[in-house]
Regions:
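Low-complexity, glycine/alanine/valine/leucine- and proline-rich hydrophobic stretches
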Residues: 150-164, 169-173
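Short amphipathic alpha-helical interaction segments
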Residues: 136, 147, 177-181
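Catalytic-core loop-and-flanking beta/alpha module that positions acidic residues
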Residues: 144-145, 157-158, 183-184
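Short catalytic/ligand-binding loop motif for oxyanion handling, primarily in non-cytosolic enzymes
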Residues: 71-77, 151-153, 178
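Residue-level marker of positions within ordered structural domains that often coincide
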Residues: 68, 149, 193
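Active-site scaffold segments
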Residues: 142, 169, 189
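Long, compositionally biased interface segments
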Residues: 178-201
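A surface-exposed partner-binding patch
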Residues: 1-146
């Protein structure tokens, strides 16, 4: 039987606290981030239902499993990711923070082709990924984690023909780019766990 999301994250927390320097982080224990993080509980079923009703979506089960353990991570950089050969650390939004962010980010639809000054045909072709629709902003993308408020991990509820609902994609600003990250929350957490395990075990 494989480890659950909660079990993998508990191990990840330990790796992060013990190896923060190598990860380029402040000491989460000394700074008090980890203590605050430990106080954060999981989201309730009624909170999930409220979120789903607000946006007319059905949250994936693995997302609910993650958020049943921790409804956000505060300042603790829980998600240590290797995306496209870039090591990036994310904090997890709470469901309430996700709602707030949705009011100004990914709150409209805009294709890459709507920005010809930034995205030439060649650039769009280079970015092409048959799992992700060619948007820069899309109402069916939901940011759930952030890297310094300039990069976001997002749940994708409207994938392209080779993608799947609930896949995880990464938006990074300046230069703006959308990058496929994982087929699901489950795979994302598994990647985080493996990345830390391989580096620090």
């Amino acid at each position: 039987m494989g480890k659950t999301i909660k079990e993998k994250l508990k191990e990840a927390e330990k790796y992060i606290c013990e190896n923060f320097e190598e990860l380029g982080l402040d000491d989460p224990v000394e700074e008090g981030y980890f203590e605050e993080y430990e106080q954060i509980g999981g989201a309730s079923e009624s909170e999930f239902e409220d979120f789903e009703k607000t946006f007319g979506i059905k949250l994936p089960e693995d997302f609910k499993e993650l958020y049943s353990y921790k409804n956000g991570s505060g300042y603790f950089e829980l998600l240590q990711c290797d995306i496209d050969d870039r090591e990036i650390n994310f904090t997890l939004f709470s469901l309430e923070e996700m709602k707030k962010v949705k009011s100004y980010f990914q709150d409209r639809d805009a294709l890459l082709t709507d920005y010809p000054d930034y995205f030439t045909d060649d650039v769009i072709e280079q970015m092409r990924d048959n799992r992700i629709k060619p948007y820069l902003f899309h109402k069916d993308w939901f940011a759930f984690a952030t890297y310094l408020n300039c990069g976001y991990l997002m749940l994708d509820f409207d994938p392209d023909k080779e993608g799947k609902v609930g896949q995880v994609i990464f938006y990074i600003h300046d230069p703006d780019e959308i990058i496929y990250t994982a087929s699901s929350i489950d795979e994302l957490i598994d990647n985080v766990w493996k990345f830390l395990k391989e580096n620090f075990d």
